Amino acid sequence: MKLNISYPANGTQKSIDIDDEHKLRVFYEKRMGQEVEGDSVGDEFKGYIFKITGGNDKQGFPMKQGVMHPTRVRLLLSKGHSCYRPRRTGERKRKSVRGCIVAQDLSVLALSIVKQGDNEIEGLTDTTVPKRLGPKRANHIRKFFGLTKEDDVRDFVVRREVTKGDKTYTKAPKIQRLVTPQTLQRKRALKAKKVKNAQQQRDAAAEYAQLLAKRLHERKEERAEIKKKRAESLKN
């Protein structure tokens, strides 16, 4: 079985092939999300605590959280479910997935290091992979650099160098939820437009009601005139 071990603190990942069934026995009958001590896996993992995050069987079917079964099952999946990406709006499909219980017929088991042990693991805990992109949302940038609301966030955006041919230039992400005088002015203009439209609708409704009352009054007078003429003709 292959173990895909990740260390989120450093952003590193490493694959290890283990053929000895006795070393893997500690993972059997465990569920996704459970923590397992790594002492029995090998001496280099002494003191480590792993968290089971997923896996695939020999045919490539992924493990699905919440399915309490050690084998494959067929589930009707829709948008929002893991292990399925709908191609059309509202599409559902019955797909084969593995349960969340670890069994012997898995080919890959994904683990995450929760607690580091005594020894360093080469290529996993002794190196650090820097994040490629910085925060994008305005509040996240403020939190990242410890800024106040008075500071201009645009000066602190993490830029990255891009080389295209002979040219080297920097790129910065578009800051999301950035509050500027221009956005506030747009918000005020939109609010004023809504108020103006509502007032126009009220004026139009009042004008229509006035016109309708006038037409009803004219029709009432016409009917009264017709009745009066009819009564006079009957008398004569």
UniProtKB/Swiss-Prot annotation:
Pfam families from the UniProt entry: Ribosomal_S6e
Name of the gene encoding the protein in the UniProt record: RPS6A
Gene3D superfamilies, alphabetized: 1.20.5.2650
Main location class: cytoplasm
Keyword Ribonucleoprotein assigned: yes
Location in the cell: Cytoplasm
Function according to Swiss-Prot or TrEMBL: Component of the ribosome, a large ribonucleoprotein complex responsible for the synthesis of proteins in the cell. The small ribosomal subunit (SSU) binds messenger RNAs (mRNAs) and translates the encoded message by selecting cognate aminoacyl-transfer RNA (tRNA) molecules. The large subunit (LSU) contains the ribosomal catalytic site termed the peptidyl transferase center (PTC), which catalyzes the formation of peptide bonds, thereby polymerizing the amino acids delivered by tRNAs into a polypeptide chain.
Family membership: Belongs to the eukaryotic ribosomal protein eS6 family.
GO biological process, one term: translation
Species in which this protein is naturally found: Candida albicans (strain SC5314 / ATCC MYA-2876) (Yeast)
Keyword Ribonucleoprotein recorded: yes
Gene Ontology CC terms, in alphabetical order: cell surface; cytoplasm; ribonucleoprotein complex; ribosome; yeast-form cell wall
Assigned keywords, A-Z: Cytoplasm, Ribonucleoprotein, Ribosomal protein
One annotated GO molecular function: structural constituent of ribosome
Subunit structure: Component of the small ribosomal subunit. Mature ribosomes consist of a small (40S) and a large (60S) subunit. The 40S subunit contains about 32 different proteins and 1 molecule of RNA (18S). The 60S subunit contains 45 different proteins and 3 molecules of RNA (25S, 5.8S and 5S).
Alphabetical list of SMART domains matching this protein: Ribosomal_S6e
Name by which UniProt lists this protein: Small ribosomal subunit protein eS6
